Amino acid sequence: MGNMRCMYLPTGKYRCSVRNLEGSLADENITVTDMALEKNYDLTVGSLSGKATWENGSSFDANTPWGIYLENKDISFEGNITQDGSYKIPNITAYGTYDVTVIPLNGSDDRTKVGTVTINSETTEQDFVISGYLLQITLQDSTGEGKSFVNVTISGPETSPVNYECFTNFRGEISLIVSTPGTYEISVNNISCGNVTVTDKNVAKVIQM
């Protein structure tokens, strides 16, 4: 039996999370009014596993960590994608239909939707295909050291005029998914520092500044 805890909170909107050592068991938006609110969670834990592949035939890079997420308007769960594309999302505590998104964890905050899944049993398996192309960019100084925590703008080609705002990680790296081939301009402080051209596969490039 779980523990019961009383909390006194100002009225407003909150995020209620229940976690163990393996991760999130429940994660829900709640609204506190001037009335008493009681929340109970039946924590029957399930899992989702499978494999993610690239539609363009590329493989996952060992140096780029990936997250995979189940999301709906009230609750979310998360897991990691390994180098061979396999993944597992443990501790799913609510049956239902979810959007499935992926994101490189050293890149932008933009998640890419790869499908939906219905969780209605304790064990679910489903594979997903990632459309688009991965840009892996490393910014270095003249000595070859990565330029960490730099705000970078990536401007899309004329066929897809979109700008992505990203911060490099502590190694000077950025990874993000773009939807169309073409030449992308890399800028820092509105100054162009190079281009990356996407043809039919994921692309990695080092840019020295």
What is the role of each PLM region?
Residues 2-3, 7-22, 94-107, 180-191:
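A short, solvent-exposed beta-strand micro-motif common in secreted/extracellular proteins
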Residues 64-70, 150-155, 186:
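Hydrophobic beta-strand segments
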Residues 1-7, 11, 71-90, 157-175:
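Short, acidic Ser/Thr/Gly-rich low-complexity loop/linker segments typical of extracellular
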Residues 24-28, 73-80, 109-115, 159-166, ...:
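Surface-exposed loop/edge segments in extracytoplasmic proteins
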Residues 57-62, 144-148:
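A short beta-turn/strand-edge loop motif at beta-sheet boundaries
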Residues 41, 48-54, 128, 135-141:
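A short, amphipathic beta-strand motif
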Residues 28-45, 115-132, 196-209:
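Extracellular beta-sheet/turn segments enriched in Thr/Pro/Gly and aliphatic residues
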